Structures are given as C-alpha cells and as structure tokens.
C-alpha cells in the first residue's frame, strides 16, 4: 500500500497491510523498537497542498501554456480570427478560449507569501463529472474547438508571418516569429512533436491532442527553492484530476555519453514495465506509469554531451531552438522539457538505437541547467523545485551510467511499503564486469571484491542496527516526507544543501571536505531527525551495476574524494552522535545506534593508523625471518633491503601526492603498485614460513597435539587470526549465495591491499585542500535568443512551423547518434604536458636529496635496520612486537566476527520481512 499524504484512496500493495499513513500505523503488528504510534511527530511546516485545483477527474485540462502549433488557436496567434469569433467565456470545458476571461481570477491577483500560490482558484465554475474526463488523451489546450478554425477549410486565411531579422549566421527555415503571452513573467510553451516520431506511437487522433502529441517547455528564471512560489508547475498537476506521484526518479548527469545514459534509461524503463505488469497489485498495475515520473537533470548546457542530448530528442523530450537565454530581462536558470514518451532504447554493439514501446509510456522531465553548478544543485532542482510541486511519496536517485536491475526500483519501493519507519534505502552496487572480461584487469577485480564484501558484511550489519553510514548516490531511495525540514527550516535537506555553499571563504576546510560525501551527512540527519524515528535499510533484492575506474590515475582521483569525504563525514557523525537523543527512537534503538557508533569509531581509528599498522606488521614479520632457526643472515639482509625500499616508496608517495597530478605521474604510480604487490607476496611468504617452522619446532621438541595449535603463540597470532577472517569471508559469501568473487577476485584484492592502504590514503590526506569533484570550470555555451516583454504582455518566440521542418529537425538529431562515436583519446594539452614535466623533475630532485641524507644518517647512526647485523639484540623487543602483532590481527578477526553476526541477523530478519 502506498502512503498518500494528500489523502487519495490508494490501496494496499499485494498482500502486505502496513500503512504508510501515520494515522493508520495501528494496522501493523508491534515489533521490538517499533511501538504502535506515529513514526513522525507532527512538525510539518507545510499543509497538504494542491497546485491548480481541478475537478475530480483524470483529464488533462487546460494549463497556463500557449501552444506553438502553427494552427491559429492560441491567444495572439491570430487576432483577425479572434476579432470576428468571440469565444464563449464558459464553454463545455473548463476554460474559455480567451485567457482574458480568466485573467483577473487566475493570474493577476496579488501574491501572498503566506498562502500557497496555487490555492486561489474558484472551483465553483467547473461542471460536474463527465464521462469524457476519464480520457487521458485529450487536448492540452482545449476550447470548444481545440485548434480554432480548420486551416485546410476554404474560408480559412492564414495571417502572414513575420520573418526574423537577417543575421550573418544561416537562419533555419523553420524558425518563424510568433507572439505568446507570459503568465506572471513565466514563459511556458506547448511544442508539437515531429510527425516522424508521432507516427510510431499511439496518440490522440487529430484534431485532438494529448501528452503524447506535445512537449511542454518551461523557461525557469528562478532559484530551485523559489520554483513553486514563482507559480511554475508540472504536467502531472494539470490534469483535471491531478496525478499522484508515488515514485519520483532522478537521473543526474554531467557529460556522460549516449551509451551510459541509455544504459541507465533502459534499466529505468524495464522497472516501469515490471510495475505495470503487476496487475494484482493495488498500487501498481496497468496504469502504474501514471504514478511514476522520471526526471533527467543535466548539469550545464555547455557540458551536456551532444549525442546524449540527441537521444533525449529521439525520445521526444528535447527540441532544439525552443530555449531562451532570458525572459523579460531575467536570466533563465533551467530549461525544463516535459513529455510522456513511448519510445524505447536498446544497445547494440556499443551503439544506441530507438525502438517503439507499447503499453507502458513513461512520464519524463528533462531539466537542462543553464550553468554547471555541480550535482548537489541538481538535487536541489529535484527536491526543492519539482518535488515541491509533485509531492511524491518515494524519491529514487540514480547516476547516469548506473543500470538498475529489471525489478530493483520496485524492491526499493517495497522496502518503504512494508516498513513505515523506513526513511531511506539502498540496494547492492555491483561492478559491471562485461560477462567477466573486466576481471582480467586486477584493479577492477580488486574493486569487485571490495564492493561484494561491503554488500555482504558492512551494509547488512548497518541495516540490522538501522543506520547505514552511506546510501550511495548512484542508486538509493528516500521517503520524501523524511527529508523535509521542520517549521524552523532545519532538517535533512537543509543540512544536505549546505554543501552547495561550501566553497572558498564560505566554509572551513573541514566542512568543505565533509561535504564531498554529502550523502553521508544526509543519512545521519535522517536517522537523528528531531522528534522522528526514521531508519535506513539495505535491500539485498535490489541492485544496480556501475562502471569502476580501470586505470590507476582515475582510481586515485575517485578515491581521494571518497576517502576525504567519508573520513570527515564520519568524524562529524561521531562528534554529533548526541543528536540521536533528540530523535523519537525507542531507548533500545538508541542503545543499538550507540553500539554502532562505537563500531564506527573503531573502524575510523584503524583507518587513521592504517599506514603505521601495515608498516609495523611488515617490520615484525620480516624480523622473524632473521632468526637463526629461520633464514638467519639471509633473512636479515632481505629484511633490511625490503625495509629501505619500503620507506623509499612511502616517501615517494608523499612527494608525488603533494605536488604531482596522478595522470602525469602514471609511470611512478604503476611502479609503486608493482612494488606493493611484491611486498604483499613477501609478507604472505613470511607468514606461512614462520608458522610452518614454528610448528615443526614444536613437533620435534614435544610431539604434536591439537592443543598445540593454540599454545604455539606464533601460529595462534598469525594463522588463526588471519585464517578466521578469511574463513568468515568465505562462509558469509556462501550463506548469502554469492561466493564467486572469492574465487575470481580474492587474490587480486589481497595483493592490492598495500596499495589501498598506502597510495590511496597518502594521496587523499595530502590533498585535503582540494575540495573539487574533479570537474573543470564552465565552458561558454552558445548564446540563446531572449524573450523580451512587449506591450500587451506578449513576447516573440521562434518556433517550428511545418511538418517537414519538424521531421527534418528530428532526423538531424537521430543522425547524431546513428553511428558509433569515435574512440575517445585522452589528449594531454601542451600546457599540462609541460607542467607535468616540470613537476616530475622537481619531485625527482627532492627524492634524491631526501634519500641521500637518509642514507647518510642511517650509516652513521647504524639505524634503519643496519643494527640487525649486530649480535646484541634485546629479547624484549621481540616480545613487544609479538604482543602488538597479536593485538592487531585479533582486532581484525574480532571486527570480521562482528560484521558476520550482523549479516546473519540481517538474513534472519529478511526471512520474515520478505525484503
């Protein structure tokens, strides 16, 4: 059952009965930590609202737009006709043909900030419910005769059009000036779809029109937070019975190509088809698509990939030449295109192609931001602008390039449906392996193992407690009401959107780094929300596939942002843990969250001391090999050599991280990766060799019994602790019925562990000053025409006029992605190449200087391992080293056991919950 905060009578989902409405929570059974009372105390600053109240029907009624159809029905399009044919102010439908009839009642009343801008409409003038209201496919603008006079009739005389002013650039044939009226300064147009596209999909027969025959364009001239107050609206609220949006899906993109975009959209389309196929569901079913809106938000008009934009045009969600730079002197901040598409996508050999889809349309919003303002600003448009209008139940966040499973979005939604206290959820993020081919790259295999282990141990553990430290922005979902701020303007979204202002002098460096992982801040704020009891859940049944870096330079840059953001966000969450006590969670839940924060603190401490811990383990193991019973002098020599190389490589990491670009130092970094792999192989050999020798010595002296495995200190400290960790990894993977990564990626991950600890951590902490997302500054976009106000409240717009012109424009867009794109080459500019050369020379000089002085000090002081060749060694040093080794390794084993128990609890709960 879906929770509809507006009170619409939506039924239950399948056989589940928990109600999402806080007034009906007594329908579920009580459970520990979930008493039968409201999941959120009454603290909603906004009363339930409607936008453009309409009669109770599902008919697409007239809306404050003007058609740019070539047919002269719109106000200002054919004044000769209007002078001789005065329309009836109250026709058989809701609106008159002449907007002046509604001018005073609808558009010129003084705006009162205390009242919702869409609530001042008189409903008394509307007729009673009619049978025709149930038809979705009715005119968007529909007077008695929706299109005015028949342009092909004998008595029709078309008014001459005004040619545009000549310009040096070639003028497109289809651009013709039309006059349209602005509503409260807002330019909104209904643009006809190209006949070439329209002929492939079901739609209203002429002269009718519907959401399939026209695309709606809005030129937003405001900040996202003011979108609702500036009286902008969306199609879903313009039906005679406004459509309830149960699922609002955001797809954010920057400059992703058409292949990545199509991969995501194909996954979204399949999920919508799946929900439409659930005919026995009381929430979904045949018309499920009417409750789902997909919003594609592109970060910057100059940044969008032209092939991706062409794919959107192929879907009917974009038309070239419609957008404006300014409206009435106000800069346009976002271009919003709305269309219900019935066109599908498919990928063949790395190429995108269109295919007709039947029975399951998709309501789409394409928001093309004028400027590049980063991903968090895109989410402001999604939540503050469009979410405020649509008032959805569940919001799903996707990155372009992430492909959700065919029913993954449904399973995410289901988690909210069965648990009224679920405020956020995420699925499993999988590495896209191309049928295993990418596993040949050790870097990809290592990341695959890392992702799998997180989904098997970390996420289930955190879900069992109710707080997941991060819901990945690439694929996650939130309950819209859980995100809302309180009446004082404080809450999850307020904290989340602070990240947009965290630049330069506006924020400290700690806060700026913290907001590199703003999704972690959002998770903490939801769980600790004042007077609420929201929880975060992991949904194993849901998954999304994504690409991972396959080159070292890209990998380092990605992890720099991840590591810095997650570390500082974890510090923030731990330092503000006390805010959990202001929430309305039960005492038991608060205690569980307290235990989880202790666990998070221990993890953070291990991350902070990661470099030191790894070096000490290396030093102790190599020192063991120098014993006379093991390798003797050979072990001592190898230990000193490896220790010098280890420290030299570590210093090189620091020098490169402080001054060099990873892309310009790729050879250095790859050399270090190979060295760390060699170190890991040597450590593995040392651990096994030391253990075997210690067991052999035990057998020769006293014989062998099973208890000797636990009394032999070296064996117990090394093999049992490490072995138990790896055995738990295998066991958990088999229990979760997902063990293949243990056979295909385990060795690669183990070999890359020193690289993760040393290279990535050093680069991240040496670049805490860099708070960028790795994107460059704005490119200059092509300047668009402006819409300037004329006497009478009208503006001139350039519009497509002719079926042939519309088809030509549509086919030109299709041609942009008809062929495979040229293979991308990373071309380094001459400036970057010269800068890399200078920095490389500087780093080489610094390294030679440091190593020469270090060698001099080591030789003079007999330090840095040279003392190993002396016969005078203290046994206490070995004792301390052994104790330290045991503490570190058993701590690792204990943490793994803790994760394992949490994962088992998650599976137990999942057996009864069904999600």
Swiss-Prot record:
InterPro entries: Chitin_synth (IPR004835), Chitin_synth_fun (IPR004834), Chitin_synth_N (IPR013616), Nucleotide-diphossugar_trans (IPR029044). CDD domains: Chitin_synth_C. It catalyses: [(1->4)-N-acetyl-beta-D-glucosaminyl](n) + UDP-N-acetyl-alpha-D-glucosamine = [(1->4)-N-acetyl-beta-D-glucosaminyl](n+1) + UDP + H(+). It is an enzyme of class 2 (transferase). Disruption phenotype: Leads to elevated spore production. Residues 1-65 are annotated as: Disordered. GO terms for molecular function: chitin synthase activity. Its main location: membrane. Keywords: Cell membrane, Cell wall biogenesis/degradation, Glycosyltransferase, Membrane, Transferase, Transmembrane, Transmembrane helix. GO terms for cellular component: cell septum; chitosome; plasma membrane. It is a multi-pass membrane protein. The keyword Transmembrane applies. Its EC number is 2.4.1.16. The keyword Glycosyltransferase applies. It is found in: Cell membrane. The chain crosses the membrane at residues 561-581, 605-625, 637-657, 672-692, 715-735, 844-864, 887-907. Belongs to the chitin synthase family. Class I subfamily. Polymerizes chitin, a structural polymer of the cell wall and septum, by transferring the sugar moiety of UDP-GlcNAc to the non-reducing end of the growing chitin polymer. Plays an important role in septal growth or maintenance. Mediates colony spore formation. This is Chitin synthase A. It comes from Aspergillus niger (strain ATCC MYA-4892 / CBS 513.88 / FGSC A1513). The lineage of its organism: Eukaryota, Fungi, Dikarya, Ascomycota, Pezizomycotina.
